[in-house]
Swiss-Prot record:
NCBIfam families: PRK00132.1. One of its GO terms (cellular component) is cytosolic small ribosomal subunit. InterPro entries: Ribosomal_Su5_D2-typ_SF, Ribosomal_uS9, Ribosomal_uS9_bac/plastid, Ribosomal_uS9_CS, Ribsml_uS5_D2-typ_fold_subgr. This is Small ribosomal subunit protein uS9. Pfam families: Ribosomal_S9. It comes from Shigella dysenteriae serotype 1 (strain Sd197). Keywords: Ribonucleoprotein, Ribosomal protein. Gene3D superfamilies: 3.30.230.10. It comes from the Bacteria. One of its GO terms (biological process) is translation. Belongs to the universal ribosomal protein uS9 family. The keyword Ribosomal protein applies.
Length: 130
């Protein structure tokens, strides 16, 4: 693509996002669709924009993103993590600000597995006294 582009990989739950950043005018493309087309929920769009708004670069950078796996919330979180990593590659001085906001740390929470003899991960079958 361009010679001055920056890359970041983001992960959250079972989603993985590859984020490419280059100087531009604020266009965000996710899986060949615009941010508004890809995420119907306003909260997901807000999560994606958070790192850019924090460092005031919403209108200065173009983002090209491919994201796979998981659901809407997981994908939004993965994109946010990827954007954060790409921004740090773009300008290392942004790291402390992004870390303070909590965007640098990967959210390691995963779905707990279902156990044998239980209905879900922790939900036990109903107990009947008699």
């Amino acid at each position: 693509m361009a010679e001055n582009q920056y890359y970041g990989t983001g992960r959250r739950k079972s989603s993985t996002a590859r984020v490419f950043i280059k100087p531009g005018n604020g266009k965000i493309v996710i899986n060949q669709r615009s941010l508004e087309q890809y995420f119907g929920r306003e909260t997901a769009r807000m999560v994606v924009r958070q790192p850019l708004e924090l460092v005031d670069m919403v209108e200065k950078l173009d983002l090209y993103i491919t994201v796979k796996g998981g659901g809407i919330s997981g994908q939004a979180g993965a994109i946010r993590h990827g954007i954060t990593r790409a921004l740090m590659e773009y300008d290392e001085s942004l790291r402390s600000e992004l870390r303070k906001a909590g965007f640098v740390t990967r959210d390691a929470r995963q779905v707990e597995r279902k156990k044998v003899g239980l209905r879900k991960a922790r939900r036990r079958p109903q107990f009947s006294k008699r």
